[in-house]
């Protein structure tokens, strides 16, 4: 986020979407950081939601213990439970951020020098979020972002993350192997979107495209 804030004033047209590791950060702090970036970039900020399953990363923060699991073994009940917990926490994280961005009404700032009033307190609202991982009362300490709701994105490689994309994101990045799998992934994400009551919301799903430059690795490297 700090790098994006530094880059923002020297750019004009690109969106700035830093990654936030939600497993080891707090949604209140992240929400105001992204809101500030939206001001610095005049409405071009977004956030990419990322979870961490690394015991090494967890040790650096010291907030929680992360089990050592083979996350590629998706049939392992322990892996499924752990992954679902991370993604569930991420969904709550996004919900808190969105509520905090909406906790200031658009005209909450008065900036009346004569009376010394900067805000109309009646236009700031508690969010009163209580979940399994967070309890956040609000409101935010940063005014409503220029966009209102900065763009939320997420990368998904499997069914559980697809649920996060469908239920919480504005943009989803996926990695299909072929066109048939791409259709299956989009169907799964749209189903999750509908189940979350977001069927009318705009959700863009973008797939990675692998480009082969040449049949030979050496020739491809040369190109």
Predicted regions and their residues:
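N-terminal glycine-rich cofactor-binding segment that shapes the pocket for flavin-like pterin cofactors
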Residues: 1-223
């Amino acid at each position: 986020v700090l790098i994006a804030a530094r880059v923002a004033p020297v750019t004009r047209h690109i969106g700035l979407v830093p990654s936030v590791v939600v497993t080891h950060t707090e949604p209140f702090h992240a929400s105001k950081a992204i809101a500030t970036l939206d001001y610095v970039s005049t409405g071009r900020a977004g956030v990419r939601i990322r979870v961490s399953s690394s015991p090494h990363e967890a040790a650096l923060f010291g907030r929680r213990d992360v089990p050592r699991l083979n996350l590629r073994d998706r049939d392992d009940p322990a892996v499924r439970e752990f992954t679902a917990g991370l993604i569930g926490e991420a969904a709550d994280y996004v919900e808190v951020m969105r509520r905090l961005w909406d906790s200031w009404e658009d005209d909450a700032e008065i900036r009346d020098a004569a009376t010394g009033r900067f805000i109309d307190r009646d236009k700031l609202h508690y969010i009163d979020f209580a979940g399994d991982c967070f309890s956040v009362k609000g409101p935010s300490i940063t005014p409503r972002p220029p966009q209102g709701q900065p763009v939320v994105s997420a990368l998904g490689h499997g069914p559980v993350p697809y649920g996060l994309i469908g239920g919480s994101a504005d943009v989803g990045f996926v990695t299909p192997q072929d066109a048939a799998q791409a259709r299956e992934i989009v169907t799964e994400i749209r189903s999750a979107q509908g189940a979350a009551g977001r069927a009318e919301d705009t959700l863009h799903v973008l797939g990675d495209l692998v480009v082969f430059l040449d049949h030979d690795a050496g020739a491809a490297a040369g190109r």
